[in-house]
A protein has these predicted regions:
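Residue-level detector of high-confidence beta-strand sites
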Residues: 67-70
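Short, basic/aromatic recognition patches
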Residues: 38-46
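Short beta-strand scaffold segments in enzyme catalytic cores
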Residues: 54-58, 63, 135-138
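Alpha-helix N-cap recognition
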Residues: 31-37
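Short, flexible loop/turn motifs enriched in small residues
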Residues: 48-53
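Active-site-proximal loop/helix of nucleotide/amide-processing enzymes and allied scaffolds
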Residues: 1-17, 26-29, 41, 73-166
C-alpha cells in the first residue's frame, strides 16, 4: 500500500491511501484478430443495443487482443479521438479496430461515420507513435459493415450487405 501526504487548503494535513490490486481476468477475445468474424462476441452484443456505443479494440503487432474500452453514449458525430488514443497508449497497442453500433438497424455508414473514419485515417498519418488503423466496423441488427473487408484490405466476410468504398 502506498501512502502520500497532502496539505488541505486550510493548512490541515491528511494522508491519502491507495492500493494497487492485481486480478486475473479472462479476455473476451482469444488469439489473433484479423477480420470481423474474430470479433463476433463484441459484434453480437452490439446488434441489440439501443444506446449508441463505440468500442475501441486494441491489438499488438501480431493482431493479438490486448484490451478494449467502451465509450457509452458516443456516436460518430460526438466521439473524441484523443480519449481513444489515451487508452491505446496505456495498453501499448500497435493496431486498433473501432466498433460502433447503429441502433437504427441500418449498417450503412452515415456521413458522420465517414468523417470519423477519415479523422482516424488522418490521425495515423501524423501521430508520432504510428498507430495502425485495422478496421472500422458498424454493427446493426443482423448485419454489419466493415471498412477493411469492403475495401479489399482484409479477409472476406460472408455477412456483408454493403460495398461502400472510402
Amino acid at each position: 500500500m502506498n501512502n502520500e501526504e497532502h496539505k488541505h487548503e486550510e493548512g490541515k494535513r491528511y494522508l491519502k491511501k491507495f492500493e494497487i490490486v492485481e486480478t486475473e481476468v479472462e479476455l473476451p477475445i482469444q488469439g489473433q484478430v484479423r477480420d470481423p468474424e474474430d470479433l463476433y462476441a463484441f459484434l453480437k452484443d452490439l446488434e441489440s443495443e439501443h444506446v449508441p456505443k463505440i468500442i475501441g479494440v486494441y491489438l499488438d503487432q501480431n493482431h493479438l487482443f490486448l484490451g478494449h474500452q467502451v465509450f457509452l453514449g458516443q456516436t460518430s458525430a460526438t466521439f473524441d479521438t484523443q480519449v481513444f488514443y489515451h487508452y491505446y497508449l496505456m495498453l501499448l497497442a500497435k493496431r486498433f479496430v473501432i466498433l460502433i453500433n447503429h441502433p437504427s438497424g441500418d449498417s450503412t455508414p452515415t456521413e458522420d461515420d465517414v468523417k470519423l473514419i477519415k479523422k482516424f485515417q488522418a490521425d495515423v498519418q501524423v501521430l508520432s507513435f504510428k498507430p495502425f488503423f485495422s478496421d472500422f466496423i458498424i454493427v446493426a441488427k443482423k448485419s454489419y459493415f466493415s471498412m477493411a473487408t469492403n475495401d479489399g484490405t482484409a479477409g472476406h466476410s460472408g455477412n456483408q450487405e454493403h460495398t461502400t468504398k472510402f
